[in-house]
Amino acid sequence: MSRARETVRRTIRDANRASDVIARLRALFAKKEANIESIDLNEAAQEVIAVSLSDLQRSHVIVRSELADDLPSVTGDRVQLQQVILNLVRNAAEAMREVDDQPRELTIRTEADGGDRVRLTVQDAGIGLGENAPERLFQAFYTTKEGGMGVGLPISRSIIESHQGRLCARPNGGPGATFSFSIPRSGDSVMNALTLGGLRNVAASDGMTQHIGST
């Protein structure tokens, strides 16, 4: 009987988690128009760190910021880009949850990427990518986390691609993994491209709405 009760509790818990994820996805997808503006990516990253710091400290995560001086601004939707940064930070912290034999270090870094792009990187000292090809991490509903829904990274990639950028993952030389995205620096051509429809509803770019249309 106790096993049956535990099965029921687990089923209810998983259903509640799925319902919460679906609600958040619908809220994101309901945003019809992006607020396009010039963004200081350093400032955006610092704001994400600030709102995440208490959770990171409770998880014994050491945060290191390596933010480039005189970083060129980027053009896009601040909320969407901060959603991506927050997701990468949370994933990094989660990857280090079981690490006990070394410091749980999370490094967030910004830099100019060539002459016309800006890169943001989140590096952790967690369990790494294992034998899973990095590209699989960006497939909808693929997850390596217990209880995970596998939607955060696909949505993040859709957001970055809608900003004319690229999001990728790679294993570190030592422990952990590195996730980074690169997007164009601000300029008239970028502003025009985004205004003409580059920043549409991210759901439309990956077909994910068909999975959340009903519960």
Regions found by a protein language model. Name each.
Residues 129-141, 197, 213:
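Short conserved segment of the HATPase_c
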Residues 101-120:
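Short beta-strand-loop-beta element adjacent to the nucleotide/active-site pocket used for signaling
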Residues 1-16:
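Histidine phosphotransfer helical core of two-component systems
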Residues 5, 37-49, 109-112:
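A conserved beta-strand-to-alpha-helix junction within the catalytic ATP-binding
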Residues 152, 156:
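Short alpha-helical Gxxx[C/S/T] motif in the catalytic ATP-binding
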Residues 160-161:
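Detector for a conserved hydrophobic position within an alpha-helical segment of the HATPase_c
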Residues 46, 57, 62-72, 113:
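Conserved catalytic submotifs in the C-terminal HATPase_c
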